[in-house]
Amino acid sequence: KYSYRNPKNYIKFTPELFQQVAPVEIYRAEEKLLYRFIGKVPVFTYDNNKTLSLNSCNIVIPQIEGMHIKYILAVLNSSVAAFYINKKFHSVKLLRSHIESFPIPVISSEKQENIIKKVDCIINSNKNIYNLYTELDTDIMSLYKLSKNQIETIYNALSDKNLFLAAR
């Protein structure tokens, strides 16, 4: 989650030879989120390197006024999002409509900045980041004003899923 490893293999980008290709400007966007199309929980990563991806990894470029892309990244990678998407859609496929239906709390720029600092630490860290994941997940949970019982329900429902994929 949050970041991706540097690739070891490459495909020559010749879109005219490919079966299915998004417009080049989407791949080459200054900032975008890449997400795993198939999986038990949502897995989003931030890209500001104009990275190309295969079709098993979809692209979303959030344009929500007043919301920073890394704040949206944190919310979409949260246990709340995983729980919501699992319970509402009962699918291993993560569709754009699923993402668009997920409510993202409106918070101040200052609060977003605190979350973004943690996201940046996760993206840039090579060390064990489990504690950062947990801390960030707790921060996101608090935005939804969930009770202890609701939080416990979410964690119990996701207990068999790997929520903390290694970043590097």
Segments the model singles out, each with a brief description of its role:
Residues 106-168:
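Non-catalytic DNA-recognition/assembly elements of restriction-modification systems
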Residues 1-113:
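Polybasic, glycine- and aromatic-enriched phosphate-binding surface used to engage nucleic acids
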